[in-house]
Amino acid sequence: MENNREGPYSVLTRDQLKGNMKKQIAEISEIFSLSKPDATVLLMFLRWDSHEVSEFLVENNEKVLSESGLKPVVVDPNQDLYKISSCGICFKTCDDGDYLISTPFCSHMFCKSCWRKYLEKNFYLVEKTQTRISCPHGACQAAVGPDTIQKLTVCDQEMYVEYILRSYIEGNKVLEIKYCPAQDCNYVIEFHQKNHDGADQEDYGFNVVCLCGHIFCWRCMLESHKPVTCNNASDWLFRDLNSLSKESGEKPLSLSSFETREKTYPLSSIKATKKVCPHCLRPADLGTKQYLRFLTCACNGRFCWKCMQPEEAHKTESGFYKFCNVSMTFEGRAPKTLEGRAEPENSCVGLWKASEVSLKQAKSDLQAFEESNIKNPSDLTEKDFTIIRKGLMLIVQCRQVLKWSCVYDYLHAEYEMSKREYLRFLQADATSLVESFSKTLNEEIGRASSATYENFCCVKHKVTIETSNIGNYFYHFIKTLQEGLDDVKVKSYDDYGGLFWLCDRCTYGNTWFHKECLMCSDDIAARVDLSDMSLN
């Protein structure tokens, strides 16, 4: 769905990553006739850059070996190495000289217990990896490599291997490698910088699809959030969504606040003289003019204050006003009040929640398909299985895009109402397309389980074509949103310049410091005089 080019990353297991690391060590060892422990120390010291290692070994061999700790340390001629029987840290005496261990480049001897404490405290349990592990002796720069570690316990050796692998992942300046952020996932992602188009992905990042099924943004490591930027996604998850969902999130709307679209109004400020406009669901205030029968909201909608029906419902064919029936409802529904109002289904939070339900269902369908194939292997080849799985995986991606398009909707200013309406149209069209594709795919999966090979060839071709079509559709859907829906003009005010922007709804001039129209966002609706209406 991103595009048709080769993916800029590879999904690897830890064993595959270890294999790549060992291969790199073996190449340096073979080319420059170094031992593998020394090659490991050199690569770790130069942050796994084989090209830089080659240059240093060719141009200044002695210098790089000395700086990395691979040159022997000058031993005190008066020191008798055979008489050393005590640890250099804890000073415990050992009868067996083999119990004390030193590096191949110095004569500083330490017991296994002190080696473990030193390595754990300064390297293994430290969050940031170092480019070199040196001898525990304070002034000694001798390198500690695999040949020294293999003299320690098995547990110490395993911890060292994990540390080297962590250095390969976190300290690698040639390859960009990250763990998949999904819970209980052990896959790692290797990023190919040569395929990366940094300018296009600077703000939005790009989606990574792990083999575990998790889709996330490489740049910020949050779940995939296109078409919004990484900063917008972070603000939404950790600030905006929390504030918007305090009363209308997982629980029913409480009486402590009233949420309408993106703005929250405390109920303490909404008096008995306020009701919800049946046209735009905004608070409308009758104020001191309680003798008025009809009220004009900021959205230009007029309604009866008693029965909440539109003004047209009170007119006869001759144009005269008739008595209103308070028991009547607006369009067959009960009058809306602030206390009993539920969250609008078309609000950003409501759409977000509905999209999350659909996304969970798509992930559940994908997991069910994989588990059924493991428990009850079918006659499908690996290629056929991949085609169907790719279609189910695409549905998950599309559902995630639709989910985050709700945040894109939330970010639009009030004066971009035309773009918002067009966005809602695109969302509805995309949702319909995904649902149709999902239904078709489930039908074809059912046929594939019982179809002959000849019939499945037709099924496979149909799934492949539709997967390609919907992938291209959503690629352009994302691109259209990221470009800001430029094809839609917000009336004539898009080209208006100066110190103010004009609201698309009421044409009020707002300063550029205000994202929402000050007039329309006011919780007090516009009021009309007696001269503006007829009273019975």
From Swiss-Prot:
Q: Where does Zn(2+) 6 bind?
A: C304, C307, H314, C324
List positions binding Zn(2+) 1.
Answer: C87, C90, C111, C114
- Keywords carried by this UniProt record: Metal-binding, Repeat, Transferase, Ubl conjugation pathway, Zinc, Zinc-finger
Q: What is known of its domains?
A: Members of the RBR family are atypical E3 ligases. They interact with the E2 conjugating enzyme UBE2L3 and function like HECT-type E3 enzymes: they bind E2s via the first RING-type zinc finger, but require an obligate trans-thiolation step during the ubiquitin transfer, requiring a conserved active site Cys residue in the second RING-type zinc finger. The active site probably forms a thioester intermediate with ubiquitin taken from the active-site cysteine of the E2 before ultimately transferring it to a Lys residue on the substrate.
**EC code:** 2.3.2.31
**Which protein, by its recorded name, is this?**
Probable E3 ubiquitin-protein ligase ARI13
Could you mention a single GO BP entry for this protein?
Answer: protein ubiquitination
Which residues are recorded as binding Zn(2+) 4? C217, C220, H225, C230
Q: Which gene encodes it?
A: ARI13
Q: In which pathway does it act?
A: Protein modification; protein ubiquitination
**Binding site residues for Zn(2+) 3:** C180, C185, C210, C212
Is Zinc-finger given among the entry's keywords?
yes
